[in-house]
Design a protein with these regions (language model features):
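Outer membrane beta-barrel strand-and-loop segments of large Gram-negative receptors
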Residues: 302-308, 342-354, 454-518, 546, ...
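Periplasmic N-terminal accessory/gating domains of Gram-negative outer-membrane beta-barrel systems
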Residues: 49-126, 132-140, 155
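Gram-negative outer-membrane beta-barrel transporters
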Residues: 363, 465-467, 490-576
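Surface-exposed extracellular loop regions of Gram-negative outer-membrane beta-barrel proteins
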Residues: 331-333, 395, 399-444, 465-489, ...
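Structural signature of Gram-negative outer-membrane beta-barrels, strongest in the C-terminal barrel
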Residues: 315-321, 342-468, 518-520, 546, ...
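Transmembrane beta-barrel wall of Gram-negative outer-membrane proteins
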Residues: 169-193, 207-242, 255-275, 307, ...
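C-terminal beta-signal and adjacent terminal beta-strands/loops
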Residues: 566-582, 602, 609-668
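Flexible loop and strand-edge segments within Gram-negative outer membrane beta-barrel domains
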Residues: 196, 211, 231-304, 337-346, ...
Length: 668
């Protein structure tokens, strides 16, 4: 049964969260106003709720949550929250309230990041020690996107002394240096690299085939405060991933490299923020199959200027950005058939204006209105105009909690699609235009939250519904590349969709023991106006049910954490028959996304031992176990060919069933 094993683990965590009392620690804040005494618990959880579905996470507080493989990754942390789907180890996306990964914007200091996660799902491109705060919202308000928004920001304070944050383990090593350069300037430098295959080469496999993988990234930022009203921030990031595997069954070999590069400069003066930025994502995939092969490069580049202003109840802003996208195209090799063309290059210009107003209607009732207008000049030099109004109504029920309703519309001019079943991130970006019309959405979110026992506990619930227009899915396969018959328009399914669901969370946010239990039930449905695809189908990433439990205990000289995730399997399209044509196996597929992978279940454990812990420095060891129950979670289905030339279609698991690790960390 899907929930039998996780329910046992969840029951233990729930009992701990609800009934264990933290002793020997001051966990209350008391304010005296004349003869009135106001008392509230001191929040020790890294997670804080805000208005309109906005949640803020202090990155420094992530040290109190389970650190897997010596790393408390902020994006992996998000997947344990209600409404954010847990992806497989080969899914590099972030799905918020049923939306596609490309529907949500993930950014670094406000600059879009087009590939936010490293492979295996354990690490993102964000080195935690380099950032101060993560802001997460269920809807994108700073960009033309249909989904949510995640932004990691840099610290703006000037350190009073040299700061170091170093960690090395069996999987990776990372470090951050923060150094003051005078009284008003600070430099931050971070680097990270993996050596997964050094010790785990025989454990990390895709099925029975070895998967070679590694990544590295670097951050450099400079903060300057020339006056009390001015802050200058310069930021640079570069990262690279490389992966390779060869299938013994099919003689299929894939060698891929991908990475992000971005830079930005911003100036904040009083309530005005101005920024220039550039961001790029490049993907190169080489495929070899028997005597055939193909090189498939793609990528996207963008650069822009943004200005925003806040003053009292008003805020406003403007942004313009240029795009250059290289679409996926196979350059054939090893066969006589030459590639009939070359990769398509798209260029476009996107501009936006927005404004918002906050108002207090009554002592218990407040509202905010927001209007965003956009213009997109597509690659064919056709203009597309969009107007996205939205509004939020908040009702303070005093001791009964807070109720909030948000509704609005959204536009989007970027797409991401491609092959998802090769074991490598082979999806590419393209721009609205001749291949697909701009996307749009109408959404509504009803939220409730309340705190209990002077802030010791918090509960939160969301009901959401979102319509999606102008959706695409990629239906092609690998052999379209090899035969020289590749045609992007022929491989795209076009239609509409809708997401709806309910998510709830119980959060213990004070005391030595903190954590939460979250549950989400929802649908992510798509329909395509294509013969043979009548009706509604679940999206490729849909999880009908998902349960998450996270618990952390901070003791004296040690800390421990555990997390449990249990979720329904994601859909896939299975073949109902095979036949052999020459040396090629031809599959006849059944109904689109009518099958599902087995349910996903994983338990992670973490323990920190602080050898030295004082006001100046911390030295410790981290012991962690990824997938402690050794559950084998399939990541996709594939065609197997036996030595007797028999065919079978079965699940493919990522080779490691359990991944223990030890790391040493030092903070100054």
């Amino acid at each position: 049964m899907l929930f039998k094993q996780p329910l046992r683990s969840a029951f233990v965590l729930l009992c701990l969260l609800a009934f264990v009392e933290a002793r020997g620690q001051t966990d209350s804040v008391v304010d005296k106003l004349d003869s009135t005494v106001l008392s509230a618990r001191k929040r020790t959880s890294a997670l804080a709720l805000g208005r309109a579905g906005v949640q803020k996470v202090e990155i420094g507080g992530l040290a109190s949550i389970p650190s897997i493989l010596g790393n408390a990754d902020p994006v992996r942390f998000l997947t344990s929250l209600p409404g954010v789907e847990t992806g497989s180890e080969l899914d590099a996306g972030l799905h918020i309230q049923g939306s596609e990964s490309a529907h949500s914007i993930v950014s670094m200091q406000g600059v879009p990041v087009y590939g936010a996660k490293h492979l295996l799902g354990i690490f993102s491109v964000f080195n935690p020690s380099h950032f101060s705060t993560m802001r997460y919202s269920q809807r994108a308000v700073s960009a033309n996107r249909l989904g949510g928004e995640v932004d990691l920001t840099l610290p703006e304070d000037i350190p009073d002394r040299t700061r170091l944050d170093l960690s090395t383990g069996l999987i990776s090593a990372q470090g951050t240096l923060r150094q003051a350069l005078g009284s008003g300037t600070a430099l931050s430098l971070s680097g990270r690299g993996s050596f997964i295959n050094l010790l785990y080469k025989d454990q990390i496999k895709l099925g029975e085939d070895p998967l070679e993988y590694g990544f590295g990234d670097m951050n450099l930022s400079l903060v300057s405060k020339p006056s009390p009203q001015d802050i200058l921030v310069f930021n640079l990031y570069s990262g690279l991933d490389k992966g390779q595997f060869i299938s013994k069954d099919t003689s299929l070999g894939i060698n891929a490299g991908w990475g992000n590069t971005l830079a930005s400069a911003s100036w904040k003066h009083s309530g005005l923020l101005q920024q220039i930025w550039t961001s790029a994502y490049d993907l190169s995939v080489d495929i070899d199959f028997n005597s055939m092969g193909a090189s498939i490069p793609s990528g996207i580049r963008s650069a822009g200027y943004r200005a925003s202003w806040e003053g009292g109840s008003w805020s406003a802003g403007a942004e313009t950005a240029g795009y250059r996208a290289q679409l996926q195209y196979p350059y054939l090799k090893g066969i006589t058939t030459a590639s009939p063309g070359s990769a398509e290059i798209q260029t476009a210009l996107e501009s936006s204006l927005w404004g918002s107003y906050e108002m207090q209607l009554t002592p218990e009732l407040s509202a905010s209105l927001r209007l965003r207008g956009s213009h997109f000049l597509d690659p064919e030099r056709q203009s597309h105009w969009g107007l996205s109004p939205s509004g939020t109504l908040r009702w303070n029920l005093l001791s009964a909690g807070k109720l909030e309703f948000t509704a609005g519309t959204a536009q989007q001019y970027l797409f991401q699609t491609g092959l998802t079943n090769l074991g490598m991130p082979c999806e590419f970006w393209f721009l609205a235009g001749k291949h697909a019309d701009p996307q749009s959405s109408i959404y509504g979110i009803l939220s409730y939250e309340n705190t209990i026992d002077r802030g010791m506990y918090a509960i939160k619930a969301d009901i959401y519904y979102r319509t999606l227009q102008g959706q695409v899915e990629y239906k092609g396969d690998l052999f379209d590349f090899m035969t020289g018959t590749y045609d992007l328009d022929r491989e795209l399914l076009k239609g509409n969709g809708r997401n709806f669901g309910l998510s709830v969370m119980f959060h213990k946010q004070s005391g030595r023991l903190t954590g939460w239990i979250a549950y989400n039930v929802g649908r992510s449905l798509r329909n395509f106006d294509v013969p043979g695809y009548e009706g509604e189908y679940p999206s490729n990433h849909e999880r009908l049910h998902e349960f998450n439990a996270v618990a952390s205990w901070n003791g004296r000289g040690w800390s421990a954490g555990a997390s449990v995730v249990a979720a329904s399997g994601t859909p896939f399209t299975a073949p109902d028959s095979f036949y052999l044509l020459g040396n090629r196996v031809i599959s006849h597929f059944g109904a689109h996304n009518s099958n599902r992978l087995a349910p996903y279940f994983r338990t992670d454990l973490s323990f920190n031992w602080f050898i030295i812990q004082d006001s100046r420095q911390t030295l410790g060891l981290n012991f962690s176990v990824y997938n402690a129950t050794m559950r084998e979670n399939p990541v996709l289905y594939k065609l197997y060919v036996t030595e007797e030339r028999q065919f079978a279609y079965g699940p493919l698991n990522l080779g490691f069933s359990i991944l223990p690790s030890i790391s040493i960390f030092y903070r100054l």
